[in-house]
Amino acid sequence: MSNFAKIFQSNWIDLNKLGKLEIFLKTILGIYKAPNRTHLLAHAADISSFYAVKNIYEYMKNDDEGKEILKNKPLLIRQDIQFNELKKLPKNTLGYKYMEFLETYKLHAHDREVAHFFDNINYSYILTRYRQIHDIGHVVYNLNISIESEAALKMIELIHTKLPITLLAILVAPFMSPLYRFQYIFKDKIPPNFLNPNFDYTYXDDYNYIDELSLKQYVYNLTEYFHIDKINNNLFFQKLYKYYFDNLNNSNHIRGTIIYGYNNENNNDIIFDDINNEYIFLKNPEKNYFLFKYKPRQTLLNQLYPWAYMAGMAAKKPLHSIHIENWLDKDIDIFRKTYNIIPLPDHLNLMSGIN
């Protein structure tokens, strides 16, 4: 018996159509109230995806590589993959990049929900595999886990899978994406009083840039992602972590991100920001941090979605029908070239790429 056969037997939930409809409506309501509860999204996808998954199955059983995947049902789990060995691979291999992504964002393939509501083991496997391969999509397309990056990947997945839940994500994401995002990038370490209400976010320098904003005009929230490897103060870390989860999906406020360990190699204090078509003040020597300002919603609609549509159409095969497991020790650029995968453009890398 394959590993997935055991997983299928222990996770299958037998429900009639009325029961599935009830769960679907409850999960949609739950997603609206708490978008970060990903298992609700998974349940909604289970129930709404029957015809899309059936079409994926028909495609895979008529494709040599897809047929092999359906027969062996490989999984990105510890029983099938030696994850620690992937860390020892050369740095430009798909497996190394995959592990680097998972560890950067504190993720694991085991976290992906198994499909519960399919009677057919092949259908259940296809949706489960799609969820596990999702992180591979982040890696090969070079997308981080911000709302707008997730939405761009959903656009690619919609083209490849036709899953209704991907369309829902694409439609909802612009309303969840913040209008502005401020990134404070600290050269040395985050000041201990950064979250203190009295911390001065304003600029007292001679330089100004178009539409300069004092952050005191807004409720400043920390969201998206941050690195904590240089923080020794546990109390500060706990406070930062709480801010992160409290505001993870709150798009009613201006939202910010902390990253640090960045060195300014630009000789000029004023640079032209091609993303937002404006001049920005880059360096603040006195406070020892740099500021970048993005417009995620605008970038998602005007740049990320068009690129994602083009990338989705250009790919030779959807990721779920590629035997990814055989590529983990291969060069990621060769993988991209083989399947004509177009990664995120360089000019969007700082905002939406894996950093």
Swiss-Prot record:
Cofactor: Zn(2+)
The keyword Zinc appears for this protein: yes
Keyword Magnesium: no
UniProt xrefs under InterPro entries: Coq4, Coq4_euk
Principal EC category: lyase
The EC number(s) this enzyme carries: 4.1.1.130
Recorded metabolic or biological pathway in which this protein acts: Cofactor biosynthesis; ubiquinone biosynthesis
One cellular component (GO) term of this entry: extrinsic component of mitochondrial inner membrane
Keyword entries, A-Z: Lyase, Membrane, Metal-binding, Mitochondrion, Mitochondrion inner membrane, Ubiquinone biosynthesis, Zinc
Pfam entry (one): Coq4
Reactions mediated catalytically: a 4-hydroxy-3-methoxy-5-(all-trans-polyprenyl)benzoate + H(+) = a 2-methoxy-6-(all-trans-polyprenyl)phenol + CO2
Residues binding Zn(2+): H134, D135, H138, E150
Membrane topology: Peripheral membrane protein
Subcellular location: Mitochondrion inner membrane
GO biological process, one term: ubiquinone biosynthetic process
Additional remark text: This protein may be expected to contain an N-terminal transit peptide but none has been predicted.
Subunit structure: Component of a multi-subunit COQ enzyme complex.
Function per UniProt: Lyase that catalyzes the C1-decarboxylation of 4-hydroxy-3-methoxy-5-(all-trans-polyprenyl)benzoic acid into 2-methoxy-6-(all-trans-polyprenyl)phenol during ubiquinone biosynthesis.
HAMAP family associated with the record: Coq4
Similarity annotation: Belongs to the COQ4 family.
Protein name as it appears in the record: Ubiquinone biosynthesis protein COQ4 homolog, mitochondrial
